[in-house]
Curated annotation (Swiss-Prot):
Organism ancestry: Viruses, Riboviria, Pararnavirae, Artverviricota, Revtraviricetes
Role of this protein: During replicative cycle of retroviruses, the reverse-transcribed viral DNA is integrated into the host chromosome by the viral integrase enzyme. RNase H activity is associated with the reverse transcriptase.
Further comment found in the protein's record: This is an African green monkey isolate.
A single GO molecular function term of this UniProt record: RNA-directed DNA polymerase activity
Keyword Protease in record: yes
Every RNase H type-1 domain range: 32-100
Name this protein carries in UniProt: Pol polyprotein
Keyword terms: Aspartyl protease, DNA integration, DNA recombination, Endonuclease, Eukaryotic host gene expression shutoff by virus, Eukaryotic host translation shutoff by virus, Host gene expression shutoff by virus, Host-virus interaction, Hydrolase, Multifunctional enzyme, Nuclease, Nucleotidyltransferase, Protease, RNA-directed DNA polymerase, Transferase
Natural source organism: Simian immunodeficiency virus agm.vervet (isolate AGM266) (SIV-agm.ver)
Source taxon at top rank: Viruses
Name of the coding gene: pol
PROSITE patterns hit by this protein: RNASE_H_1 (PS50879)
Family: Belongs to the retroviral Pol polyprotein family.
InterPro entries xref list: Rev_trsase/Diguanyl_cyclase (IPR043128), RNaseH-like_sf (IPR012337), RNaseH_domain (IPR002156), RNaseH_sf (IPR036397)
Gene Ontology biological process terms in this record: DNA integration; DNA recombination; proteolysis; symbiont-mediated suppression of host gene expression
C-alpha cells in the first residue's frame, strides 16, 4: 500500500471501484500543510443497531466510542464529529464514507 497517484490519501485495494468512489477520492488532492490527519470510520450492526465510531491520527492518537441505537451513517458522522472535537481549528480528515 502506498499513496494514490497524485494524492495524499493512502492507496486501498478495492474489489470493485464504482465511478462515484473514484470521483470521491479526488475531492481534495493536497492536505492542509502542517496540519494533523485524522482517519475516521464508523459502522453498526444492522440487527442490534450497536456500533462504534472512532479515529486514528498519523501520530497514533486514537479514540473509539461504542454507540447504541445507531445507523452506519450516524456512526460515520459521529466519527467525523469526534475528530473535529479533538483536533485543532484546521485539520485534514480522511473517511471512506460516501454519505459523510
Amino acid at each position: 500500500a502506498g499513496l494514490l497517484a497524485g494524492s495524499w490519501i493512502p492507496d486501498w485495494t478495492f474489489v470493485s471501484v464504482p465511478p462515484l468512489v473514484t470521483l470521491w477520492y479526488t475531492l481534495t488532492k493536497e492536505p492542509i500543510p502542517g496540519e494533523d490527519v485524522y482517519y475516521v470510520d464508523g459502522a453498526c450492526n444492522r440487527n442490534s443497531r450497536e456500533g462504534k465510531a472512532g479515529y486514528i491520527t498519523q501520530q497514533g492518537k486514537q479514540r473509539v466510542e461504542k454507540l447504541e441505537n445507531t445507523t452506519n451513517q450516524q456512526a460515520e458522522l459521529t466519527a467525523i464529529k469526534m475528530a473535529l472535537e479533538d483536533s485543532g481549528p484546521r485539520v485534514n480528515i480522511v473517511t471512506d464514507s460516501q454519505y459523510a
